[in-house]
């Protein structure tokens, strides 16, 4: 993805532009290069500096909904998703107090339609190191 470096010291959401490429060879060849937009969300922060064409949990040109992730509970929010990830990491042996922040890199919906083949969660410890 082409954008600025992800800086964990900032507790703001970020929008990224990039390209997804695919190339299949063999009997049936296929390839594509598609432009994409992704967003990095700090699940513990309510602060945002996103443009007015982006909304959380409601329709807009670009939007994101917590209910599309985690337990997929209607009317859930970032905090619910944060708790879901804390629960998953505790099953892996991490203690809640070891995790300082959780960020989600995902694809937003465009005019209410979404295609999200991949969501990545970044968990940072109390020393601000990715774990």
Where are these regions (language model features)?
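Mature, function-bearing regions of proteins
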Residues: 1-131
